[in-house]
Amino acid sequence: MFLTKHFVFVHIPKTGGNFVHRILQDHAPADWELKIFDVHATYAEIPESHRHLPRLAFARNPFSWHVSWFHFQQQERDAFYMAISDNGTLGFKDAMRRAYTGNGVLANSSGALTQTLFEMLGEGLEGAKVGKIESMREELLRMFGECTEVPTKMVEAIQQVPPQNTSTHAHYSTYYDPELRDLVRQKDAPVFDYFGYQWEDAPP
């Protein structure tokens, strides 16, 4: 989480937060009073001094988000990943089915991205300004600009700085079969519907 006197940026995992971190750390004016808070702190942890400020964040197509999260966890291997992947032995499709069906840990709840967004930004995202990572540069300029004047050097950096901490993998569509595609669409329906996300085939 990044605190300024103009806004609070909440870092949703796997939605470009490292890019935002670099932009703010390298280019935020001193009078923005930038403070780096706990990396993945939620809206409930925003200090009282900043709770009146706009909450900014990014969302991502859930189909893409699940694939990115899975690849990241193949290195991190946290307890949740180890549980759904049978200690790292299952591939993406089998691990996701294990999480979302039968006795899986998320079988009787909403999808992982829906839960993450609501936990970190508030149920229904009320009061939050949430951009789409698929057009991150334009969205970041828009969201910052709605809160304060954005310095020219920061505008240039947002337009030019390379993506940060990205994982290398094929287009998300190659990871799904029709059954898993429908399952994730159902589980994360609130995110798909709120942001207008849809399935996209890999570019030719």
Where are these regions (language model features)?
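Membrane-interface amphipathic segments in extracytoplasmic regions
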Residues: 1-204
